[in-house]
Amino acid sequence: MDFKDKKPVVAICYDFDKTLSPDDMQAQGFIQSVGYDVEAFWNESNELAKVADMDQTLAWMFEMRARSAGKTLFTRSQLMDYGSKVRLFDGVEDWFDRIKGYGEEAGVIVEHYIISSGLKEMIEGTALKDKFKRIYASSFLFDENGVAIWPAQVINYTNKTQFLFRIEKGVLDVNDQRVNDHFTQDQLRVPFRNIVYIGDSFTDIPCMKLVNSYGGYSIGVYNSETCDKSKVYKMMRDDRIKYFAPADYRENKELDLLVKNIIERTAKNEQLERKYYNCQKEVIESDSMKAVYEKQKTDLILALEDSDSFNQTHKIVEKMRNISNWTKEEREEIVQIALKNSQVFYILKDYDIRTFLNRITEGLSSENVSRLKEKI
């Protein structure tokens, strides 16, 4: 990021099922509509994945399409309609604007992202669809009639991590290959230290671990109605998360206060990062200028050595006179050139040459220096 021009960005990334909603989205209307028991549907889906050596996400996407045949429309609009019926945890609907507004007051840009193996079309059917900068979720390809015909995007717990790198680098399009390019620290749009990942289960572990290991914030949430903390306890023991809290998104509740503290900390920390960046930049620029300066001296010495006319020698010495910090080794080399190159040697008594060489030989003591002083 360019610290001179931009506010720091905090990216808050969410799983969906059991993180923002108390249950799997498919289990809140769709599975029942195709005449299946929820547990039976998932058992069959998992068995298909096992028998066919199939990705579990692809398995349930296949089952959804297959089981809907002759029972319900399997279209984009129908899936969005199922999504509109998905229940959300308390406080979720006003959470995103509230947290974004809090960030603005703290001088931080807050962005919300979904990274879920759930179904994008259902998420887009909820009241939350416009709250996210990007929704990264599994999705279908639809024909001209809006009927799902093939998986378009499949997201599982391992490939979720690529989207964190996309967010970090600001390369958000899923087909943008620049995500594989090298970015320097100052080019990163959202450094991992400013990424928050909120999830509920072991399928979130790769993302949580990645965020944690790079200095970000991983938060495990649990259903406040059941108060079952077994998963978050295990994730905490295994160093997968930094914090855990009930999935209660209402204002002034534990999760709300925790995320606000992270935003405040980010605002302060980025001031220090800005100072560090500017100090580092100054040193790099200084080193670069020094390197250019040293190269200039080397080039002038070589030019003097290769000078093939009196006129050229005068021009080179004019440039050399503007440099004050010749090293002892460089000065001795200049003395040697003055004695060896006839285009320098025969004009030693010229005023500009003489005054320059008098300055160069000051404090030096050697046979070459003595010979040169005799000539000038």
Segment roles from a protein language model:
Residues 338-344:
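Amphipathic alpha-helical segments within extended alpha-helical solenoids and repeat-rich scaffolds
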Residues 90-113, 117-333, 346-351, 358-376:
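C-terminal cap/substrate-recognition subdomain and adjoining C-terminal extension
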Residues 1-144, 235:
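Alpha-helical substrate-recognition element adjacent to the catalytic core
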